[in-house]
Amino acid sequence: MDKENKMDILNNQIFLLLLITLIGMTIGKINIKNFSLDSSAIIFVGLFFGHFGYTLPKTFQTLGLVLFIYSIGLQAGPGFFFSLRQRGLKLSLGTVAIIGIGFLTTLATTYLFHFSAGTSAGIFTGALTSTPGLAVAVEIAGGQNAPAAYGVTYFFGIVGVIVFIQIIPKILNITVKDEEQALNKERDKTHKPLHFMHLELTNLNLVDRQVKHLNLKSISPVIITRLLRKNGTEPILVGGQTILQAGDHLRITGTKDDLEMMQMYLGTPVDQDIEFERVLSGEYITVSNKDICGMSLKQLNCHEVFNVQLSRISRNGIELPAGPNLRLHMGDTIHAVGSKQSLENIKKIFGNSIKDSYNFNILPIFTGLFLGFILGKIPLYIPFSGIFYLGTTGGVLIAGLFLSNIYKTGPLIWAIPSNANSFIREMGLVLFMATIGTQTGTSILATLRHEGLQLSLAGILVTTVPLISSVFICKHLLKLPFLSMLGVITGAMTSTPGLATMAKISKTPYATSSYATVYPVALISMIIYTKLLIFIVERFF
């Protein structure tokens, strides 16, 4: 193949897309001391090819943008609304405030260096390492300024968080082990560890009464899980309809104080442990039956109907208690306890097919995209500013957020399995990053020659000012524990390398759980702040 033919093949758009993706993904996998570019390497490879005149069509960019943002909405939906309630509210406020500091710092650098709206948005999203924010910037501001600025400032965002996480314990004179022990003690106060004990029923006033009529919760929040009849050989799973008999051996779960109180109410402890596992067994069952997806455990009433007790549910790697109001999702893994025959019966209801749990219907995805597109075209009036449109990104994002939270409408299951969502997100990201890289590459050197120093300085400021401010916000205003503060900071910066660094500092789940709580809020906040940034710069700067 001569040189001319080699150049001709680079003009083939499919070949160019595949080549940029392969090189970019390969470079992105290179990890040096927790630093890696991941999928963002694609945009840098695209810049290289774009500089030499090889570009991809904008239709690739638009398609990738829509797929990527919609998948973000589907992923973040349930977690986003959950984070706005209870414990997550304080963490979410910290996240919004940290990103807000980055937003204000970007406005200051824009005023100082006279950046355009696109460049300003690129600095903001690059310094805070937000690809969804960049996607919004490209759609609204257009042109090549945003991706070029993103490419320059992204490096500072990645390195800045890693260095900050490593040095902040020393600056604040924090001993991580002491912080872990303090949080463990606090956890034990609010969430006392559960124990179990075995009692023989000696209170004759409770004989021949159903468990649901004992009003146990009004006395002490314990649960009678299983019993063994006097002289019996087979254990029984206890439910509300179970009738107690004199001499029953009961297995009760609760805190130590609650269990001691139950001794006065129910009976005397049994010294010899009762071997309940002789007949009963536990299995993990996969939800793959779409007909029960969206139903609550209370609706299924597994204990009364199938004589099976559900203890916990694993969803996307997270363990959830099997509460009565918990709704089942496709792909959930349920830990169930019962007899072999009962477990076989309930498997037929849940499906228990890993292969089927990976299946998904393409119709809800395109329906959601269509609804999002329509939503983005609806004119909204903002006082003193005129007509405002959500745009394609805003429309599909809101559609994804709400539809995934609804989960199911009739036969349509809006949420999709995590593996399918990851595929759609990565495919959209590849199309978007590769295209925007090649489009920007044609003018990247001119941008660097003209504004390279200003962009670098702005990137450093927009990364470091929010990080430094985060200590005051989280530690002094919100009174967050140190490890929770680390989770909020890395979550607000949407920094996966920062998360890896944080995990090395502390093996406990406190920091990572805070990260998981605020991450959906950070994704949505970055998109909203980016829209607002462009709006302000275009009209007032």
UniProtKB/Swiss-Prot annotation:
Matches recorded under SUPFAM superfamilies: MFS general substrate transporter (SSF103473), TrkA C-terminal domain-like (SSF116726)
UniProt-listed GO biological process terms: potassium ion transport
Record's keyword terms, sorted: Cell membrane, Membrane, Repeat, Transmembrane, Transmembrane helix, Transport
Signal peptide annotation: none
Transmembrane segments: 10-32, 39-57, 62-84, 91-113, 146-168, 357-375, 385-407, 428-447, 452-474, 481-500, 515-537
GO molecular function per UniProt: monoatomic cation transmembrane transporter activity
UniProt KW Cell inner membrane keyword: no
Keyword Transmembrane helix in annotation: yes
GO cellular component, one term: plasma membrane
InterPro entries per record: AAE_transporter, MFS_trans_sf, RCK_C, RCK_C_sf, YidE_YbjL
Cell compartment(s), UniProt: Cell membrane
Membrane topology, from the record: Multi-pass membrane protein
Pfam families (UniProt xref): Asp-Al_Ex, TrkA_C
Occurrences of domain RCK C-terminal (ranges): 183-260, 268-352
Family: Belongs to the AAE transporter (TC 2.A.81) family.
Name of this chain's protein: Uncharacterized transporter DP0976
Originating organism: Desulfotalea psychrophila (strain LSv54 / DSM 12343)
